[in-house]
């Protein structure tokens, strides 16, 4: 796919962007052929200008993601006229000493985005409470929540520990958070799990199954079994009691789809490399 260092709204840059989107959709469709469900392509623009999101929307793309809550809120304001656009927040609001008040204010501002479809990076009960309490009263549907799982074990990556067995999961932060959302957060909906695979697995994913994705699938299976065993949870999680998986980015989204992912997140492959702020 083509790439460029200029993000100015020129006819040439627009044509390049839309060519990237078209090529991504071709690969997306090919990798999805064996799936029994219809997956979602989330276009992640990161630091790119709002005109690029609008251009992709005009070509039929509807789901867009941002790593930065500030970028998402700002772009949502600029693109408020795009009524069918669905925003996905896939980043992490890191906690810094003395900045907790500001962080909570940003979380509340994020929930004010009327077409915010999902937060794919939840990792704590504390944050679940903040989001649940901040949801506007006029929001018609609960906000979808995907719990981020660290499947690679890399310390630099966010996410909760994966689980292999029900015995292991019973006291795990991951299962406790899932149950907490279902039981105590009526304005949130526990929809699924998200992971960011390691570079090593991404590079090898064309030759063999991506082990990070296999780990997430196993974790999904364990959680589904435990949630289904509780009659009080019936109909209160997932999509028809099936947890959605968000796994796969530019370098490995095709492997993610082959592994059964419901959502893939493609940034560089569509928009080009991010700009340094």
Predicted regions and their residues:
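Gly/Pro- and small hydrophobic-enriched strand-loop and loop-to-helix capping segments
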Residues: 261-277
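Conserved alpha/beta-domain cores
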Residues: 2-251, 257-259, 271-273
